[in-house]
């Protein structure tokens, strides 16, 4: 057991986690040169296309150290984006140490800090590594000082390497063996295994990635899932050397996968504990704190026949992505669908793309909203995650919106731009500290603004140098209103948005103008109105198409023309009463982009 090392690789986006993982696999001979590919752990098509890691992946390697001993390294490659921070915290729970990879050109960025603090809170040994030293812009000495100054870890002897060229990777492996402690646990104690991750395989059922804390698991053992009390037999058990390899036993401290033929998606939830059915342990391991979704949006299948498939797809996906939340919802305009909760906009995009690709669905998304706390006049407090659930205006005492604490790291040249952006987003400055050339600014910004396009705007206003990390802070009273969209006097529930009173006029106007572009002309006028309660704040009209009825009159009396025009007018009026307006998919997408330009 003292030859096992469990560690995660954490870093900011694009500091070279996945490339470093590739090198470690190559040096330890996990894959032959023929099977080796760039970013071999990013197995999803979506990950390769966007060049980001979405799912944490685990690998077991054997490494023969300089002292002649063979060590078993279990490591987990983690994502860097804020939206997938839940993946990171789960991966860290399975380790004793973490490699903090820092780009020697870019230096410390916001996610570096956030992930590092998560690791330190979990009592892990954090080992700093300076990557990309082959770049002409690299300045490892300055970055080592930065790490010490901003993060507070001694980085003077930090290992320097270049994952791309393979320079210094051997030193990294030696550092891992020396600095990261061996797992603790009792091989004789009753078995306890923590489920770190699980996914659904069409042939095997639920596959779970587990970390054995005490005891061991063997093939054909009878095991019990602690939260449900169900008993299963282990069919197959093994490790990843990125390839799935079967073994007969997983010992204390190891990380591996288990297949028990569980067909029910909720059979082995992430964060649960497995133990032996007979003589098992009494206590569950402390799992992970549940994350609260920050953004909610309605997802509806385009054709209502897909509803069943959509429900199954969401179930399978939520097994793989524990931070996804969903509940059924129905809308007058869109039929049956689900209200889904996500950790951020990127997460929402990724989930939607995965549903459309992996499960072959066509989906419509409604405008994303955050959760508001609403105090009613009778003292009741509601949590509202969709504009449709907001009570009537005269029942509301106050609406409180969620405020996010944003930690922004930015070079001092771009500080002005960033402050301007934060003020425009109704932010309040909390703190500002200078660390050499970098400035750490802390703002409290309403979550609704952060979620919409804060990240993109921050990147563009600072030429990509600013980095952001945010988390939910508190609810704060604010004058929020619901803007409804009416088509010919009928409310369309799926188009409503909740916005701040100051922005409501402009948002309403933008909304109706955008909608006007997308609704095709009909035989009668279509009035598109934005309203707050009964008060109309903006209107635009899609003009009717009309036939020239007096073209056939040649000369003749004016009363003849009047008669024809009047007849046409009455016909249009009748049409307007019974006609209904078809909303194209683009009209819904238009709403997503209101307020972005």
From Swiss-Prot:
One of its GO terms (molecular function) is translation elongation factor activity. It is a peripheral membrane protein. It is found in: Cell inner membrane. GO terms for biological process: positive regulation of translation. Keywords: Cell inner membrane, Cell membrane, GTP-binding, Hydrolase, Membrane, Nucleotide-binding, Protein biosynthesis. Transmembrane segments: none annotated. GO terms for cellular component: plasma membrane. Its EC number is 3.6.5.n1. Residues 2-184 form the tr-type G domain. GTP binds at residues 14-19, 131-134. PROSITE patterns: G_TR_1, G_TR_2. It is an enzyme of class 3 (hydrolase). This is Elongation factor 4. It comes from Aliivibrio fischeri (strain ATCC 700601 / ES114) (Vibrio fischeri).
């Amino acid at each position: 057991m003292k030859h096992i090392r469990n560690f995660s690789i954490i870093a900011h986006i694009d500091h070279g986690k996945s490339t470093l993982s590739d090198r470690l696999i190559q040096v330890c001979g996990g894959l032959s040169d023929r099977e080796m590919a760039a970013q071999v752990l990013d197995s999803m098509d979506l990950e390769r296309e966007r060049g980001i890691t979405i799912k944490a992946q685990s690998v077991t390697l054997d490494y023969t150290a300089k002292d002649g001993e063979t060590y078993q390294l279990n490591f987990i490659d983690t994502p860097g984006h804020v939206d997938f921070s839940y993946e990171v915290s789960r991966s860290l729970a399975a380790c004793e140490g973490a490699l903090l990879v820092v780009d020697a050109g870019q230096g410390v960025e916001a996610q570096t800090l956030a992930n590092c603090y998560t690791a330190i809170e979990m009592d892990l040994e954090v080992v700093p590594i300076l990557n990309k030293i082959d770049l002409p812009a690299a300045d490892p000495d300055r970055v080592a000082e930065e790490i010490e100054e901003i993060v507070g870890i001694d980085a003077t002897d930090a290992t320097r390497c270049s994952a791309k060229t393979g320079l210094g990777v051997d030193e990294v492996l030696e550092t891992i063996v020396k600095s990261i402690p061996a797992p603790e646990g009792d091989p004789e104690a009753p078995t306890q295994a923590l489920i770190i991750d699980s996914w659904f395989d069409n042939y095997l059922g639920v596959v779970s990635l587990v970390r054995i804390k005490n005891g061991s698991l063997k093939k054909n053992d009878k095991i019990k899932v602690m939260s449900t009390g169900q008993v299963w037999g282990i069919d197959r058990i093994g490790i990843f050397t990125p390839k799935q390899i079967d073994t007969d036993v997983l010992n204390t401290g190891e990380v591996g996968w288990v297949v028990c033929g569980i067909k029910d998606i909720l059979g082995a939830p992430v964060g649960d504990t497995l133990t032996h059915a007979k003589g098992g342990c009494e206590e569950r391991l402390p799992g992970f704190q549940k994350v609260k979704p920050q953004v909610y949006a309605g997802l509806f299948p385009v054709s209502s026949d897909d509803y069943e498939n959509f429900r199954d797809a969401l179930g399978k996906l939520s097994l793989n992505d524990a931070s996804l939340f969903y509940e059924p919802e129905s809308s007058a305009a869109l039929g049956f669908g689900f209200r889904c909760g996500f950790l951020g906009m990127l997460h929402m995009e990724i989930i939607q793309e995965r549903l459309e690709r992996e499960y072959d669905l066509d989906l419509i998304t409604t405008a994303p909203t955050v959760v508001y706390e609403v105090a009613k006049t009778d003292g009741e407090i509601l949590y509202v995650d969709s504009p449709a659930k907001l009570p009537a205006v005269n029942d509301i005492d106050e609406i409180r919106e969620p405020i996010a604490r944003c930690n922004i790291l930015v070079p001092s040249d771009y500080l002005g731009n960033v402050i301007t952006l934060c003020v425009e987003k109704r932010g309040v400055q909390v703190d500002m500290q200078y660390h050499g050339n970098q400035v750490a600014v802390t703002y409290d910004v309403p979550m609704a603004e952060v979620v919409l396009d804060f990240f993109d705007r921050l990147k563009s206003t600072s030429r990509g140098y600013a980095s952001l990390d945010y988390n939910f802070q508190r609810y704060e009273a604010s004058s929020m209103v619901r803007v409804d969209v009416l088509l010919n006097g009928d409310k369309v529930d799926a188009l409503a948005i909740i916005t701040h009173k100051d922005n409501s006029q402009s948002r309403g106007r933008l909304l109706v103008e955008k909608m006007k572009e997308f609704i095709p002309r009909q035989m009668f006028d279509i009035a598109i109105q934005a309203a707050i309660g009964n008060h109309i704040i903006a209107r635009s009209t899609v003009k009717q198409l009309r036939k020239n009825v007096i073209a056939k009159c040649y000369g003749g009396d004016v009363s003849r023309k009047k008669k024809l025009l009047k007849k046409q007018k009455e016909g249009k009026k009748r049409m307007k009463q019974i006609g209904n307006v078809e909303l194209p998919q683009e009209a819904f997408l238009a709403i997503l982009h209101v307020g972005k330009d």
